Amino acid sequence: MSSGISKTAKGKRGRPSLQQVLQQLDEEVSLLKTSMGGLPRAVEANAILHEIWIDDVHNSTAIEGNTMTRAQVEELVERGRASASLVEMLEVDGYAEVADWVYRHAADYQGVPVTVVSEAHRRAVELVWAKQPPASRDQPGAWRKTPVQVGKVVVSVPAAIPAELDAWSASTRDPKGRHPVVHAAVHHAWFERIHPFVDGNGRVGRLVLNFMLLQHGYPPAVIAKARRPRYLHGLALADDGNVNVLAEVIARAVSGTLTRFLVPALAGEARLVPLSALAARGPYSSAYLRLLVFDGKLKAVPDGNLWLSSKKWLQEYMRDRDPRGHKSLSKRRKKK
């Protein structure tokens, strides 16, 4: 089987290729492992994982049409109440429960057993289906017994689902030389083509995607609702054998989890982190920080394709500037 990356794929002008995106992601993950001890375990970093979890629950359910805001999702999972419809709250509750389990237990498995897929679906939809059962009367966690039409995609016929899921599950355990993100992308698209349930395949598919990523030492991919069109485009291209766009969407989502949540939370003020992580919790964009580095105004050190700086060095730069970005009067006077 091929690597899953199209040999003809090249980055458009001004847009990095998939290989470049994966290389940068691996450098970020390597930095996390070597400088910060790797991914925090749930018992060690509940606060960090909690923020990722909320973001994951909100965006993954929103991709499927749930209209609850992130603030409403947070209020529901933390306090058990929110101003939203009952069905939408049940959707969020179900997904939140399974995502929490995935974060804590993915590393306990090798690959994705079909029993995990079935149990993830059962937990994700049973409350919703108790209130609003599907017309087919399928049961939560059970493979569908009726044909479905999913746009122009040809999905598995019901009789073929058990055997195809067995083959899919066995394949999740063997990357076959693929990059872990590409391996996860290939199996995410494959799972959606099998479409084993009458409803809930998208949510379960993204849970399984993160299950695989976590097994390989990557943080969860939180695919933002705003990225839905490109994500669906990537799935459509993957159905035709080109997984590049889908893998890029996933890689960028993983990188976003790193730079927005993990690295800023784990890094002390003197810890060197990528400029993107420094920008995630600061007043400047990563592009502006890069300009400051090239101008010699912000201390930084190169590390492969990345530039690393620290909160401490950024604070030193900011102390040397007034709010308008000019050097302070006291500093100018000292130079006279």
Language model: regions and residue ranges:
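FIC/Doc superfamily catalytic core
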Residues: M1-D199, R203-K336
